[in-house]
Amino acid sequence: MKDFFVRECLKNQNDYTVATVNADIILNANESNYPLPEELAEKMSKIAANFPFHRYPPVKAENLCEVIAEDLDVDPECIRISNGSSDLLEKACYVFGGEGSKIAIPYPSFAMYGEYVGLSGSEPCYYSLNNEGFIDADTVIELCLQEKPSLLIICNPNNPTGNYNSLAVIEKIISSVECPVILDEAYMEFADGKEMPPNDMRPLHKLWLVAGSALSLLGRYSNFIVLRTFSKAYGLAGLRCGYGAGSLFLMRHLGKAILPYHVNAFTLYMAKMVYENKELYKGRIKTIDEERDKLAAYCRKMGFYVYPSSANFLLLK
């Protein structure tokens, strides 16, 4: 067969595959085991019959951008919606990386970071977590100084260790590096949320959203983007929806790589409904955190080393 041109960075890239598991209890994707809250399920069933499936969705998902922006007290242009937050991760590697550039990623962490870096044509440079799975800010800052990456990715809480890195650590890194920073906060809803900026005067429902998150630093720094997802705490993994929040400058550049009508209308409707009813999920999240801690204590009694998790999973050694 004739040899066709294929980008160099793709020639040795394999298809990413995930094993299909036929089981009653499935844990390998960190999904929620909870269905939609009953009142939201009833509302969904009523709207589905007459939903305007024949119409395109909002071009840039403006309907969802606006409600998130209102909560975060930012311009709606500072928000971008995507097919899961991993979609924005890929776009960020494409926009801020590319041939001849380096992207700094944590190890051990989410396997897809390396995939996205490779697809963008960038070179990965790894920074190691400490023995307990936490980020050492000085190590990351030094790596950025030496390697000069065009993008730095931080996973907080980290997957697969579950470690939550304090706002002080995150802010030290953000304020010290010269490249854009991606904060992947897919599991932040499960973190303790024990840290709040001391002078934050937002109402309680808005404080809960940003507790422990780099979202609370928006407006103070312009070099980072926070990614969040509806797949984990909110149980919409099957609909694929996430969002990014950052400075107007970074988000406008990121938006250039996003196609029009990129998130389907029903996903946007459901994500907006869930977002506007976040309070319904607090009890579930609390239960998951409590059961996680019980299981961690039990595993420690059995002699396992359990990484200190602030996510909805545990890593044992």
Pin down the residues of each PLM region.
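Conserved PLP-binding active-site segment of the aspartate aminotransferase-like
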Residues: 28, 246, 315-317
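PLP-dependent aminotransferase-like
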Residues: 95-154
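Active-site pre-lysine segment of PLP-dependent enzymes
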Residues: 135-147, 160-181, 185-231
